[in-house]
UniProtKB/Swiss-Prot annotation:
SMART domains: LeuA_dimer (SM00917). The keyword NADP does not apply. It comes from Stenotrophomonas maltophilia (strain K279a). GO terms for molecular function: 2-isopropylmalate synthase activity; acetyl-CoA C-acetyltransferase activity; manganese ion binding. This is 2-isopropylmalate synthase. InterPro entries: 2-IPM_HCS-like, 2-isopropylmalate_synth_dimer, AIPM/Hcit_synth_CS, Aldolase_TIM, LeuA/HCS_post-cat, LeuA_allosteric_dom_sf, LeuA_bact_synth, PYR_CT. Homodimer.
Length: 528
């Protein structure tokens, strides 16, 4: 039997629904073995409840529940499955939960006027009777039963209170009030939780019931609404890793966990999340479902702890608290990133050069900084290899340059011929075939340069207006396990793609040159 803690406990339960609601995001389906891998990571992350799927909907979800239930036996971990308010669904779900050490049966029914009339075609009284009947049935199988009033935030408040009273009287141990379509606002959901909790206070055992928030992100308010629900009395938040889910997604687990950690003094609540595992869990999910997060995603995005502004970098060098409210290592990143680009100042460039072993006097630094600024006009980001090349006097800094290219069709495939000028000024020509013009182009560039790149993502868009518009190609690639980004701009999008590819290849070339140079001539730091 699962012990239900009182709502006064100063801890927010994290109900992870990545494997159920998150998986409903287009393109994010997972096989049972993949779900098991993800469930292991969620267990290590420290979530309180893992919703593994919807057993009545597929054999795959039943298999996943069996795999996960047999392996994950942590006493403080509950495993949940979702069920409609239908006898057959509940019986199927109860059987699926037999493998779980601490099972939870999660039943739901729509309660809003829109859903009652157009989806269920049921009256208010019929919905109440269905809740009473099916929560009681679920409780006859499982001691821990959660009831969700689907579309709660668009349900009449007096009726929502009545539904919650019936569900609690029938044996529900958790009442979930979902913002199913991401419609509500923080002020509204805070008041809703306060009034529903007050409205059920006299129902027997209501003091032991946990109220839960499940917020969608259609208006970008899922995390804000979940926090407001906590202020209103919710003690469970339903969320997903990386915020994946239907439409615009769900409340982001990593964001809610870090808000509670960073602002613990304000919310006077915490969670059981092992936060240094957040980034690893996020990256595992990205690999499993093939859905990367945007670079500026809070907590887990590549830019979450990256600083390019010169003012910010200068402050960070003096005290990291000037521009960071949490430490990157607290969520699983190794360290903050000082991204050197056109917004960077001399202090950041000098600090990076010293980290690379180059100690310069004021005149030397002034000269190198001018060269650095010139390089920033040619590329978005300046890497360690670029700095090392500057310190070597810029030898071969130009790298490979595109001289010409020809794309043609060969039956159902494309053929690319590229001619490059190598770093020494020699001409190199290579051809390759591919499934399309870009695939063939990248193959020919690889043959010409000897650089092998694994493409992760690629997109093009227009820059400028009218006749002055140019195509910009952006790609992310991997080389020997390291991720690189490249950018190219041209009137022709295929040429822009070639320039983006060469942007990365030339960076790797400079890196090799710098490594070779340093292996024979390592600069000695000045003594203090």
């Amino acid at each position: 039997m699962t012990t239900i803690e009182r709502i006064t406990t100063p801890r927010i339960r994290i109900f992870d629904t990545t494997l159920r609601d998150g998986e409903q995001s287009p393109g994010c389906s997972m096989s049972p073995p993949q779900k098991l891998v993800m469930a292991r990571a969620l267990d290590e992350l420290g979530v309180d409840i893992i919703e593994t799927g919807f057993p009545a909907s597929s054999q795959s979800d039943r298999e996943a529940m069996a795999l996960i239930g047999r392996e994950l036996r942590r006493p403080s971990l509950s495993l949940a499955v979702l069920s409609r308010c239908l006898q057959a669904d509940i019986e199927t779900s109860a059987r699926a939960l037999e493998a779980a050490a601490n099972p939870r049966l999660h039943v739901f029914l729509s309660t809003s006027p829109l859903h009652r009339e157009h989806k269920l075609r049921m009256t208010r009284e019929q919905v109440l009777e269905s809740v009473r009947k099916h929560v009681s049935l679920a409780r006859s199988y499982i001691d821990d039963v959660e009831f969700s009033a689907e579309d709660a935030t668009r349900t009449e408040l007096d009726y929502l209170i009545e539904v919650a009273r019936v569900a609690i009287a029938a044996g529900a141990t958790t009442i979930n009030l979902p913002d199913t379509v991401g419609f509500t606002t923080p002020e509204e959901i805070r008041a809703m939780f306060q009034q529903v909790i007050a409205g059920v206070a006299d129902v027997p055992n209501a003091a032991n019931v946990i109220f839960s928030a499940h917020c969608h992100n259609d208006l970008g308010l899922a995390v804000a609404n979940s926090l407001a629900a906590i202020e209103g009395g919710a003690r469970q938040v339903e969320c997903t890793v990386n915020g994946i889910g239907e439409r615009a997604g769900n409340c982001s687990l990593e964001e809610i966990a870090m808000v509670l950690k960073v602002r613990q003094a304000f919310y006077e609540q915490d969670s059981s999340i092992n936060t240094p595992r957040i980034v690893g869990t996020s990256q595992l999910l990205q690999r499993l479902v093939g859905m990367p997060v945007q670079r500026n995603k809070a907590i887990v995005g590549a830019n979450a702890f990256a600083h390019e502004s010169g003012i910010h970098q200068h402050g960070m060098l003096r005290h990291r608290g000037t521009y960071e409210i949490m430490r990157p290592e607290d969520v699983g990143w190794e360290d903050s990133q000082m991204v050197l680009g056109r917004h960077s100042g001399r202090a950041a460039v000098e600090a990076r050069l010293r980290a690379l072993g180059f100690w310069l006097d004021e005149d030397e630094l002034k000269l190198v900084f001018e060269q650095f600024k010139g390089l920033c006009e040619q590329q978005r980001v300046v890497t360690d290899a670029d700095l090392q090349t500057l310190m070597q006097g810029g030898s071969n800094a130009q790298g490979y340059r595109l001289a010409s290219m020809t794309i043609s069709d060969v039956g159902s495939r494309a053929n690319a011929l590229v001619e490059l000028s190598d770093p020494d000024g020699n001409r190199v020509a290579e051809t390759a075939q591919g499934d399309g013009p870009v695939d063939a182009l990248f193959g020919a560039l690889s043959a010409a340069t000897g650089v092998q790149l694994m493409l992760d993502s690629y997109h093009v868009h227009s820059v400028g207006i009218g006749a002055d518009a140019r195509g910009e190609a952006n790609l992310s690639v991997r080389h020997e396990g390291v991720e690189y980004d490249g950018t190219g701009t041209s009137k022709d999008i295929i040429e822009a793609s070639a320039l983006a590819w060469l942007d990365v290849a030339n960076r790797l070339l400079r890196q090799r040159q710098a490594t070779a140079h340093n292996s024979t001539d390592v600069p000695t730091p000045a003594t203090a």
